[in-house]
Amino acid sequence: MKETRYFYVPEAATQQELPEEEANHAVRVLRLQPGDEIMLMDGKGCFYRAEVTVAASHHCNYKIVETLPQERQWRGHLHLAMAPTKMMDRVEWFAEKATEIGFDELSMLDCQFSERRVVKKDRLDRIVVSAVKQSRKAWVPVVNEMMSFKQFIAQHTTGHRFIAHCYEEVPKVNLFEELQKISSSLSPLTSHPSPHTSDLSPLTSDLSPLLVLIGPEGDFSIDEVRMAVEAGFVSVDLGKSRLRTETAALSAVMMMQLAMQK
């Protein structure tokens, strides 16, 4: 029995043809033939069971057999913002693993002590999509362009916001404990509806986005921490261990996931 193959097609519901890169993989690598079953994922909360109708050298057509809306595995919008590491492969590792765990949005911060100020967003997008297909996630995380720390703080003024750092002179609380408090305050029925549905339950009104900031290897500057706290961010630690940037970022995603799982 053939394993069902998954393909990322953002407009799966309205298209009848795989995107060029996916089509080449389907036809040239997997050698799919008309009649073969495939699974499409639109990255917005829906899978589609489909059947290949045409498999040619440069294109692969399909017809949708069944639409399969997916249930969210967590509540709320999980957003991680980090200063990229000097070695880009460590950021790519984080993006892959965080996507496998599950989160909604990734932002890159240009901080005072940043070791890298240029990030190839298109490469991160490809890594995230690949991880989504591998882990069978229904939502593709958004990857944002890099932004200065000051500009980012100014643009993110609502929701549950946290900044993780190592400064002893700035009082901190534990991130996971704070997330658990938020989770316990929510209605047990609170859900995050699929973008494919228009029915917004009133129970979603208490579900503000979650945002955690992770600094570069040299940490945020003390001025950046104070700027964030003055803007309403909660000063937090991730526990007693001293972590590398990408490890801290992944730990924060895991904490958000654990606290907000349905």
Model regions: which residues?
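N-terminal positively charged helical leader segments and presequences
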Residues: 1-70, 122, 184, 197
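Short, ordered loop/turn segments at secondary-structure junctions
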Residues: 67, 111-114, 240-241
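RNA substrate-binding interface of SAM-dependent RNA methyltransferases
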Residues: 71-166
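A mid-sequence, solvent-exposed acidic-amphipathic segment
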Residues: 147-186, 210
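A C-terminal functional module that forms or caps the active site or interfaces directly
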Residues: 210-227
